[in-house]
């Protein structure tokens, strides 16, 4: 006899496990299916984000930055550190231990909330039945009143640079290097490429980033992107725009990459090559032919604004549907869907999903860019404030970057907050909170911010929108 559940979730990544926990909290009998095998040879919860994405990459970013600080930044504080070295295997092991602790934490949360966990591959059949193929090959069918598909995404592979065991790798492989490559190539100047390139550049690698687009970080505000390109180039990343990779050849533990740019055909030889050209939804053997769920022209599961698929009672969330491939988007979609299944009228504001690139300085934004608003014909007022004028940033010797606030010229409503600088990921969230409640630049300017803090840069940028900044000269007084 098949087991029956109110909710069956396929996938235990940041969308799936959060959806399962919230559904269980709401009193729904919930099951969650996961097939990912971790480094220890066991099923590991948490999806790409926790196992081979967000968390492990941040661990390496933080470790590599501490090494950089010890070598380059301590001396300005009067601290002398001689003979600083890096133990790459130890750094990677620390990362793995963090992942292990967090995946175990999700299992504990499942148990605490009464979520039934199934190990294996989940496949949606007709009539909201879900087939689970266990690790031993045995199958069972679960009956569900509601199904949430959260199967995630995987790295895109490209024909000119097929992956090898250890020379040409994707983002997952780039987290496992046991030594610093002398010369590192990265295909793709997106979030993943820049973060991983930064890790190994700080540790001493000569890094070249090949980006096919002619524009750097096209989704970011142009002023912020321009500043980011300047800063990252100064840090040693050789970012080649308009560079389209056409071939690669592995020979004697190195790879020679052929690409074309404005100067014609070029060749570069690297010790390692990271392919970071984006991700694609995981739908392989996910949907039976008679499941009724449809895909769009790009292979994503089609959903409406509430993540409903073409089949009543079947939902899809996260990377397998349209929109930004971000863990926090997936998680909040999971909460929204669980609550709607339980009869609540939950909504999600897709216009206020923050984006972050965890380089140093961090790059983060929420809302619309200045160029987008101008293209839409919206008149705006803009305020900026450099961290070079921030007392707290000076005290930390971390003064690169700026905060930018964009407001509607007619209503003063804040339409975008963009940051490059220390703690940008945290600062932009303050802007997001205000924007969620319809804040104006004047509202932010009237708030009392603690002193001295990096947050004061947001305060001053908001004041600058209307020409009222205190700690910089205002370009325009209104």
Swiss-Prot record:
Residues annotated as transmembrane: none
E.C. numbers: 1.8.1.4
Keyword tags: Cytoplasm, Disulfide bond, FAD, Flavoprotein, NAD, Oxidoreductase, Redox-active center
Pfam family, one: Pyr_redox_dim
PROSITE patterns, per database record: PYRIDINE_REDOX_1
GO MF, one annotated term: flavin adenine dinucleotide binding
UniProt catalytic activity: N(6)-[(R)-dihydrolipoyl]-L-lysyl-[protein] + NAD(+) = N(6)-[(R)-lipoyl]-L-lysyl-[protein] + NADH + H(+)
Cofactor (UniProt): FAD
Residues the entry annotates as binding NAD(+): 188-192, 211, 245, 276-279
SUBUNIT field: Homodimer.
Function: The branched-chain alpha-keto dehydrogenase complex catalyzes the overall conversion of alpha-keto acids to acyl-CoA and CO(2). It contains multiple copies of 3 enzymatic components: branched-chain alpha-keto acid decarboxylase (E1), lipoamide acyltransferase (E2) and lipoamide dehydrogenase (E3).
Other facts noted in the record for this chain: The active site is a redox-active disulfide bond.
Name the record gives this protein: Dihydrolipoyl dehydrogenase
The organism of origin for this protein: Pseudomonas aeruginosa (strain ATCC 15692 / DSM 22644 / CIP 104116 / JCM 14847 / LMG 12228 / 1C / PRS 101 / PAO1)
């Amino acid at each position: 006899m098949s087991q029956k559940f109110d909710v069956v979730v396929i996938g235990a990544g940041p969308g799936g496990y959060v959806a399962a926990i919230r559904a269980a909290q709401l009193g729904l009998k919930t099951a969650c299916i996961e097939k990912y095998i971790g480094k220890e040879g066991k099923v590991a919860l948490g999806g790409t984000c926790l196992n081979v994405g967000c968390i492990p990459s941040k661990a390496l970013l933080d470790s590599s930055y501490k090494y950089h600080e010890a070598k380059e930044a301590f001396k300005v504080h009067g601290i002398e550190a001689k003979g600083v070295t890096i133990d790459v295997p130890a750094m990677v092991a620390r990362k793995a231990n963090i992942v292990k602790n967090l995946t175990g934490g999700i299992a504990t949360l499942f148990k605490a909330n009464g979520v039934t966990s199934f190990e294996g591959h989940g496949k949606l059949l007709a009539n909201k039945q879900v087939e689970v193929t266990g690790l031993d090959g045995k199958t069972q069918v679960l009956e569900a009143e509601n199904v949430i598909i959260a199967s995630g995404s995987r790295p895109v592979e490209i024909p000119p640079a097929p992956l090898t065991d250890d020379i040409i790798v994707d983002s997952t492989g780039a987290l496992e290097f046991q030594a610093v490559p002398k010369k590192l190539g990265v295909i793709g100047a997106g979030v993943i490429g820049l973060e991983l390139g930064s890790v190994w550049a700080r540790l001493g690698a000569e890094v070249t980033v090949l980006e096919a687009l002619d524009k750097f970080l096209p989704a970011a505000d142009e002023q912020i992107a321009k500043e980011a390109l300047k800063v990252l180039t100064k840090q040693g990343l050789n970012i080649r725009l308009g560079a389209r990779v056409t071939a690669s050849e592995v020979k004697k533990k190195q790879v020679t990459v052929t690409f074309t740019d404005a100067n014609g055909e070029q060749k570069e030889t690297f010790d390692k090559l990271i392919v970071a050209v984006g991700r694609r939804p995981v739908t392989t053997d996910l949907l039976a032919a008679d499941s009724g769920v449809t895909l769009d022209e790009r292979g994503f599961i089609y959903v409406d604004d509430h993540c409903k698929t073409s089949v009543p009672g079947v939902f899809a969330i996260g990377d397998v549907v349209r929109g930004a491939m971000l863990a926090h988007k997936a998680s909040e979609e999971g909460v929204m869907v669980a609550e709607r299944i339980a009869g609540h009228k939950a909504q999600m504001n897709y216009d206020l999903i923050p984006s972050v690139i965890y380089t140093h300085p961090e790059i983060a934004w929420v809302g619309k860019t200045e160029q987008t608003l101008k293209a839409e014909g919206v008149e705006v007022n803009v305020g900026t404030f450099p961290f070079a004028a921030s007392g707290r940033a000076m005290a930390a010797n971390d003064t690169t970057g700026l905060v930018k606030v964009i407001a509607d010229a007619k209503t003063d409503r804040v339409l975008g907050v963009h940051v490059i600088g220390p703690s940008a990921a945290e600062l932009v969230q303050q802007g997001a909170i205000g924007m969620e409640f319809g804040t104006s630049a004047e509202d932010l300017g009237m708030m009392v911010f603690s002193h001295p803090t990096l947050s004061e840069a947001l305060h001053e940028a908001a004041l600058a929108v209307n020409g009222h900044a205190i700690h910089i000269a205002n370009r325009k007084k209104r």
